[in-house]
A protein has these predicted regions:
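Conserved ATP-binding/catalytic segment of the ANL
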Residues: 2, 6-69
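Adenylate-forming
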Residues: 23, 37-38, 56-85, 114-134, ...
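Generic, well-ordered alpha-helical scaffold segments in large soluble proteins
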Residues: 30, 37, 48, 83, ...
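C-terminal boundary motif of the adenylate-forming
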Residues: 48, 87-113
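Conserved C-terminal "lid"/linker of ANL adenylate-forming enzymes
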Residues: 67, 92-94, 142, 146-199
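Beta-sheet entry/capping signal
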Residues: 15-16, 56-57, 66, 91-94, ...
Length: 199
């Protein structure tokens, strides 16, 4: 579906480009931002998109979030993360791989579902952290990651992961008020855990 009077195109890197009468003329008193966003009449959206056979377009990820592995492969984190998060046992997944030789992930379990599973397995625990450290829970999440990996290409597969010992929290700056992950902040806060995945 294309809006009347609009043209769409994909740049070589997959960025969605748009032009037409309803595209804005630029940022008010911000010529540099305008120059970076509007080039040769095309609005550079900052979104990576995919065009389908029926000419419809799907937004895949933000261009700024694209990772480039040590091997030079461009990867879209949200594709990998959504595959992992399709598990009911996994609440959040943050993949790491920019400049790295393989993909790893920080995973937050779904407390309610994993705790119900643990009770059904007759496993006793006291805290969220205690639950994430249990061998049975780690094995459960490994099986879920392995299942999700089957739908990913070799370079996208999550090779190692770390279970977060606490739930991501807005007050700690890990997520926004609307619960969107703050990737750069999390990478700083969990640097030790990330580095341990690559040892």
């Amino acid at each position: 579906f294309v809006l009347p009077g609009m043209e769409y195109s994909l740049a070589e890197d997959g960025e969605l480009l748009m032009r037409g009468d309803n595209v804005f003329l630029g940022y008010y008193r911000k010529p540099e931002e305008t120059h970076n966003t509007l080039k040769a009449g095309w609005l550079h959206s900052g979104d990576i998109a995919q065009q389908h056979a029926d000419d419809s377009i799907s937004i895949i990820d933000r261009k700024k979030d694209i990772m480039i592995t040590a091997g030079g492969k461009n990867l879209t984190p949200s594709v990998i993360e959504n595959s992992i998060k399709s598990s009911p046992f996994i609440h959040e997944c943050i993949v790491i791989g920019d400049g790295r030789r393989f993909i790893s992930a920080l995973i937050e379990i779904d407390l309610e579902i994993v705790s119900n599973w643990a009770e059904n397995q007759k496993l006793s625990y006291t805290t969220f952290k205690n639950l994430t450290q249990m061998d049975d829970v780690i094995t459960l999440i490994q099986s879920e990651v392995s299942r999700a990996n089957r739908s990913l290409s070799d370079v996208e597969k999550v090779r190692r992961f770390c279970l977060l010992s606490k739930q991501l929290d807005h007050d700690d700056g890990e997520v926004t008020a609307t619960m969107k992950v703050r990737r750069k902040q999390i990478e700083k806060l969990y640097l030790d855990e990330i580095e341990a995945l690559y040892q």
